[in-house]
């Protein structure tokens, strides 16, 4: 099956849509031609599928990698920048990314920190679950799903709060953490167009405390809402014509999870892993990642808001206040 689902040209913003909205499909890629060649916002995933996705998409628009001069990365995750290795085989563009994701773009091992893998391993060890994730390798996990990560040669910090001119588009850089510490969205005010990255789409992106957590995610949605965008193009999925409604839906889904946890605690005290299993009643790997990070993000907010508390002890249970 082709990794490309379709294409769209929005007044010079050329979109390459991935075959599906769910990971490990690559992110949508945005291409903006100009008199010097072209710029890209995100480049897609590593692995052979990611390579085909990128090259086939550019071929559709009659473009070649050698003419790429600028890459803006919404964040340093493998489905958004894994294909940078294929780019660097042909050309060495200027690469812009938020300062908080620069380290991960240059040395992907830092993703184990922002994905909160150590947190997940700690909670898993305390819980005594039979599945052993003590040797979990995040990058093998990426490779196994065909969504490999790769490193940039050099990057520049993108000017948060300022504008970046890409062809005929003037994008305001909006810092929108939650899913990644340096996640950005790009807003063209004249067109009312918001490139929302992973934060708005069919469902919420995963989130961990180190990436901004639930608190950061909700604040990012507030920031997006204040822009009063008309149209959103997410990193995963198709064009969204009612931007405000899409943002409200994601916020509602996030808060529904919080309410679900609160109601679970009304039935009695529960451990961290019991709450994680309530949120994600699927396979153990989802309990481990991203389940632990998501659960921790909710509990941090709920403790801050004074609606739950944790009992004493290493494996203390959570209770409602």
What spans do the regions from the language model cover?
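Metallo-beta-lactamase
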Residues: 38, 45-48, 136-149, 165, ...
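C-terminal regulatory/interaction regions
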Residues: 260-321
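Short Gly/Pro-enriched turn/cap motifs at secondary-structure boundaries
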Residues: 5, 20-21, 146-148, 153-155, ...
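Conserved beta-strand hairpin/beta-sheet module of binuclear metal-dependent hydrolase folds
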Residues: 4-61, 67, 93, 110, ...
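Short, leucine-enriched amphipathic alpha-helices that occur as contiguous helical runs
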Residues: 42, 93, 254, 258-262, ...
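Histidine-centered divalent metal-coordination motifs
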Residues: 74-80, 98, 179, 183, ...
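Active-site HxH/HxHxD metal-binding segment of metal-dependent hydrolases
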Residues: 25, 45-52, 57-164
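Aromatic/hydrophobic pocket-lining residues that form the small-molecule binding cavity
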Residues: 54, 217, 221, 295
């Amino acid at each position: 099956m082709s990794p490309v689902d379709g294409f769209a040209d929005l007044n010079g913003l050329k979109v390459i849509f991935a075959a599906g909205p769910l990971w490990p499909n690559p992110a949508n890629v945005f291409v903006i031609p100009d008199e010097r060649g072209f710029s890209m916002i995100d480049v897609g995933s590593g692995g052979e599928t990611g390579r085909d996705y990128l090259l086939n998409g550019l071929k559709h628009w009659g473009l070649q990698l050698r003419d790429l001069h600028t890459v803006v990365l919404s964040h340093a995750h493998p489905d958004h920048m894994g294909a940078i290795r294929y780019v660097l085989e042909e050309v060495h563009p200027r690469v812009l990314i938020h300062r908080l994701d620069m380290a991960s773009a240059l040395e992907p091992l830092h993703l184990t920190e922002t994905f909160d893998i150590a947190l997940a391993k700690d909670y898993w060890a305390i819980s005594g679950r039979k599945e052993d994730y003590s040797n979990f390798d995040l990058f093998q996990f990426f490779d196994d799903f065909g969504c490999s990560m790769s490193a940039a040669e050099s990057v520049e910090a993108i000017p948060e709060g300022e504008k970046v001119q890409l062809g005929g588009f003037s994008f305001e850089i909006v810092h929108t953490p939650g899913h990644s510490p340096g996640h950005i969205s790009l807003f063209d005010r004249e067109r009312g167009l918001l490139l929302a990255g992973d934060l708005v789409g069919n469902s919420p992106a995963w989130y961990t405390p180190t990436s901004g957590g639930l608190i950061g995610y909700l604040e990012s949605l507030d920031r997006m809402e204040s822009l009063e965008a008309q149209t959103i193009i997410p990193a995963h999925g198709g064009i969204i014509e009612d931007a405000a409604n899409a943002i409200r839906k994601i916020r509602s889904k996030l808060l529904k999870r919080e309410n679900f946890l609160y109601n679970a605690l009304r039935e009695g005290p529960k451990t961290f892993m019991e709450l994680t299993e309530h949120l994600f009643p699927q396979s153990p790997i989802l309990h481990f990642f991203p389940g632990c990070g998501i659960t921790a993000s909710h509990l941090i907010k709920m403790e801050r808001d004074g609606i739950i508390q944790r009992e004493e002890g290493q494996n203390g249970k959570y209770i409602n206040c």
